[in-house]
């Protein structure tokens, strides 16, 4: 019965799911991102028609990031990180004002922090160019790993398909000739 129910959909349902539908898909914003979704994140690929397939070399080609795009993404992430640190600092200052009397009583127990440690904390470990190079290398390594996994899966599937073909051929031969011994003439 469930099979029959899925075959008898109304035309209204298909109208809602068609690409020409007046309804648009929404993109859920990622945590920590601005409330308005960026068009880059919401880009929906057009549905491919049946029978059209892209070769493996073209699948990853349109998703490659140029070094300029990687650098721009890193800069955006760095500005978000700086804003987050500023907000955390402002929040900590508000808490510090409320807990001032507790800190005054505990200050005699703890050693004062040296001003040199604060400057060292703010210095970046890598330059922006180095971070870009690291990101490119990580992306390339990840892509290579995915390609290797894909090749392994394809080889396994091919071996399974070949094994089933051999079994099928053997069964066909056994049906046709039965238990008779094979001869070169037949």
From Swiss-Prot:
Please provide the record's keywords in A-Z order. Nucleus
Q: Where in the cell is it found?
A: Nucleus
What GO CC terms are in its UniProt record? chromatin; nucleus
GO biological process terms on file: myoblast migration involved in skeletal muscle regeneration; negative regulation of skeletal muscle satellite cell proliferation; positive regulation of lamellipodium assembly; positive regulation of macrophage chemotaxis; positive regulation of myoblast differentiation; positive regulation of transcription by RNA polymerase II
InterPro entries noted in UniProt: Akirin (IPR024132)
Keyword Secreted appears in the UniProt entry: no
Q: Where is this region: Disordered?
A: 14-65
Highest taxon in the source lineage: Eukaryota
**From the record, which residues define motif SYVS motif?**
183-186
Where in the sequence is the signal peptide annotated? none
Q: GO molecular function of the protein, one example?
A: transcription coregulator activity
Residue spans of biased composition, Low complexity class: 49-60
Name the family.
Answer: Belongs to the akirin family.
Its biological purpose is as follows: Molecular adapter that acts as a bridge between proteins, and which is involved skeletal muscle development. Functions as a signal transducer for MSTN during skeletal muscle regeneration and myogenesis.
Name by which UniProt lists this protein: Akirin-1A
């Amino acid at each position: 019965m469930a099979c029959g129910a899925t075959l008898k959909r109304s035309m209204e349902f298909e109208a809602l799911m068609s690409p020409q539908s007046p309804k648009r898909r929404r993109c859920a914003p990622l945590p920590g991102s601005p409330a308005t979704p960026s068009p880059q994140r919401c880009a929906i690929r057009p549905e491919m028609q049946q029978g059209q397939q892209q070769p493996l070399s073209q699948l990853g080609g349109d998703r490659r990031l140029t070094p300029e795009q990687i650098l721009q993404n890193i800069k955006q992430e760095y500005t978000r990180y700086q804003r987050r640190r500023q907000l955390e600092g402002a929040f900590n200052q508000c808490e510090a004002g409320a807990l001032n009397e507790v800190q005054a009583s505990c200050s005699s127990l703890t050693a004062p922090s040296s001003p040199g440690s604060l400057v060292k904390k703010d210095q970046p470990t890598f330059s922006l160019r180095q971070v870009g190079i690291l990101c490119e290398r990580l992306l390339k390594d990840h892509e290579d790993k995915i390609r290797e996994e894909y090749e392994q899966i394809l080889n396994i599937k091919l071996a399974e398909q070949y094994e089933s073909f051999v079994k099928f051929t053997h069964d066909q031969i056994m049906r046709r000739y039965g238990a008779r011994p094979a001869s070169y003439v037949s």
